[in-house]
Swiss-Prot record:
Belongs to the universal ribosomal protein uL29 family. This is Large ribosomal subunit protein uL29. One of its GO terms (molecular function) is structural constituent of ribosome. The gene is rpmC. The keyword Zinc does not apply. One of its GO terms (biological process) is translation. It comes from the Bacteria. PANTHER family: 60S RIBOSOMAL PROTEIN L35/50S RIBOSOMAL PROTEIN L29, LARGE RIBOSOMAL SUBUNIT PROTEIN UL29C. GO terms for cellular component: cytosolic large ribosomal subunit.
Length: 77
């Protein structure tokens, strides 16, 4: 899975972002389990997933603080 960019994340709806966080957390759990059992080959993926989760939370917080417009609320007629 490639790195998620903030610009791509800003195009997603709030529900899609929450689903993305859930998926990433599940992946992180699996990676941590593999790491603990010594089966993890790509250790850099742990860091990538943690940073992706932080990016999603940042976009959600920007919307909560009205720093950027929510694509759900700016539907044009």
């Amino acid at each position: 899975m490639p790195k998620l960019s903030a610009a791509e994340l800003r195009q997603l709806s709030g529900e899609e972002l929450r689903n993305k966080v859930r998926e990433l957390k599940e992946e992180l759990f699996g990676l941590r389990f593999q790491s603990a059992t010594g089966q993890l080959e790509n250790t850099a993926r742990l860091r990538e997933v943690r940073k992706d989760i932080a990016r999603v939370y940042t976009v959600l917080q920007e919307r909560n603080l009205n720093i950027v417009d929510d694509p759900d609320s700016t539907k044009e007629a």
